[in-house]
Every structure is written in structure tokens, then in C-alpha cells.
Amino acid sequence: MASIKEIKTQITSVVNTKKITKAMEMVAISKMRKTEERMSSGRPYSEIIRKVINHVAQGHLEYKHSYLETRKIKRIGLIIVSSDRGLCGSLNSNLFRKVLFKIQNFTQKNIPCDLILFGLKSLPVFKLCENNILSKITHLGEHPNILKVINGIDVLLKKYQIKRIDKIFIAYNEFHNKMSQYPKIIQLLPLSRIKSETISTKRWDYLYESESKLIIDSLFKRYIESQVYQSILENIASEHAARMMAMKTATENSTERIKELKLLYNKVRQATITQELTEIIAGASAVSTG
């Protein structure tokens, strides 16, 4: 049985750990709320630019952008968004499991995959795919730099435009609420047209400041970039939510462990006192009988 001193040391250690996990939980809550606000404010931009693309495309039916072109799949691109830090439960491992299953399915069909990796946690997992990794983007922080994101995916988009890649997916953790985050893989390219009653079937005539093709190309590129950026924000919000829950669980476990150690401390202390009293009584009896 552990001594009283050892138990007191354990209690102190667990109490200090509890303080750390509680602080990390509060920090994660604050960061999650801020990221959630940025994520919510970015959604209307993606929706509006998608509607603009559809309106403009209807005005130029003779021009079919490569982002709308469906091709026979010979090679795919996969953008994987993970976190830079750990202590967020099974968030990353669940995503990687889904991605690896996706890659395995394409590999069985003899379709190679080119990868773009976001986040430090993805690097060791896909180390064996080093020859297929086009770029690695890490340390994005709480406020991802849009230029850093664009530069990271640019090589993949160029390969798609010259038909060296036929389909592009992005894998990330979708944020639902602080309790629920789900790994998700969606198709980025080719784009599918919006089927909505809000989009009129009427053909529109537009006046352009410069060549219409350049404007349409720019709109398509901006839309894909906004989708990737939005996915990164979703993943960051999911990371903070998962870390908040992990730290909350750790704090609760620490509280339970402290209760157990205090109970053990009292038992050991009581046993020690009882033993000392027994020894004193035995000594006194020996003296009186001697």
C-alpha cells in the first residue's frame, strides 16, 4: 500500500492537471466561438458567388468551363484538412480512417491519388504516400492566411485544368455543434450546376469590363478557393469543439480521481493511526507486566 506522502504527492499532481485541463477547456470554448463566427460570416459569400456563376454561365452557354467538364477518371486529387495540434479526441483519426478507405477504393480500381495536406497531424499518417503529395501546408493558426491556402491548392487546380487530374475531393471535419463533428469528403471538381427554383432559366445578357472568359474563369477559381477556405474554418471550429469536450472529460476524470485518492488517503491515515495506537498499547502492557 502507498504511503501517506506518496498519496499526497499524487493528489497534488492530479489537482495541478485538473487546473490545466480546465484552463484548456475554457480557451477552447473561446476559440471555438470566434471561429464559428468567422465560419458563419463566410458562408453567404460562397452561396452568392455560386449563384453568380450560374447566372453568368447561362449568359454564355457556348463557353463551357473545365470546372464543369465531366471526364473519365484516370487520376484524382484529394485535399486533406487536419489539425496542427492534438488533444482533440478522435477527431483526426476518424477523418484519416475515412480518407484511407477512400484512397483504398480508388487504388483497387488502379486510379492513383495526388494529395494536398493541411495540418501537421496528417504528415505522419500519409508518409508512405510521399511521392503523391503535391504540397504540405501547416501552422495555419486561428486565422488562416487566404494566400497561403490558395498557394497550397494552386498546383492541384493547375493539374486539373491541363487534364492531368480528372476529379478533386476535399476531406475535412464538418462542424455541426459543440457536441457533434463529423468527418466529411465532398467533391470539389467538377462542379455540378445548381438546381434551384431561385435560378431563372432565362438567358441573361451581360456587359463586361474586360473579356468575359477571364471573368468567368476568375469567378470559378474564387469559388473553389472559398470552398476550401470554408472547409478549413469548419475543421478549426471542429478541432476546438473536440478539444473542449476532451478537456471537459479529462477535468471530470480528474475530479473523480481526486475523490478516490482522498478516500485512500483517509484509509491509510486511519490505518497508520490505528497501528501506532496498537503499538503504544502493546508497549504499555509490556512495561506494566514487566
UniProtKB/Swiss-Prot annotation:
Top-level taxon: Bacteria
Membrane-protein topology: Peripheral membrane protein
Pfam families: ATP-synt
GO molecular function, one term: ATP binding
Main localisation: membrane
Compartment annotation: Cell membrane
InterPro entries: ATP_synth_F1_ATPase_gsu, ATP_synth_F1_gsu, ATP_synth_F1_gsu_CS
CDD domains for this protein: F1-ATPase_gamma (cd12151)
SUPFAM superfamilies on file: ATP synthase (F1-ATPase), gamma subunit (SSF52943)
Record GO biological process: proton motive force-driven plasma membrane ATP synthesis
GO CC terms: plasma membrane; proton-transporting ATP synthase complex
Alphabetically ordered keywords of this record: ATP synthesis, Cell membrane, CF(1), Hydrogen ion transport, Ion transport, Membrane, Transport
Subunit structure: F-type ATPases have 2 components, CF(1) - the catalytic core - and CF(0) - the membrane proton channel. CF(1) has five subunits: alpha(3), beta(3), gamma(1), delta(1), epsilon(1). CF(0) has three main subunits: a, b and c.
Stated role: Produces ATP from ADP in the presence of a proton gradient across the membrane. The gamma chain is believed to be important in regulating ATPase activity and the flow of protons through the CF(0) complex.
Protein family membership: Belongs to the ATPase gamma chain family.
Protein name in UniProt: ATP synthase gamma chain
Lineage of producing organism: Bacteria, Pseudomonadati, Pseudomonadota, Gammaproteobacteria, Enterobacterales
